[in-house]
A protein has these predicted regions:
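Non-heme di-metal
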Residues: 1-73
């Protein structure tokens, strides 16, 4: 298991969360004047949240593997 990748994953999660928030704010900003643009930004926000969840789930799995190795499983 690559510890550098494991150590970097929380930063990746935070970056995805920040991107999701940025897109959501843009969606709210353009909701009234450009609803199609707002919809696109909200869709992009959802994609970033999905990316965040994928990374988070993988991180949890990798940490679980470390726990198993520690416990001799």
């Amino acid at each position: 298991m690559d510890h550098e990748t494991l150590d970097n994953m929380p930063k990746l999660i935070a970056a995805e969360a920040q991107d999701a928030m940025n897109y959501a704010h843009l969606a709210l900003e353009h909701r009234e004047d450009h609803p199609d643009l707002a919809d696109m930004f909200m869709e992009l926000s959802g994609e970033e949240l999905r990316h965040m969840k994928m990374i988070s789930d993988k991180l949890a799995s990798m940490v679980g593997e470390l726990h198993d190795r520690y416990n001799g499983v």
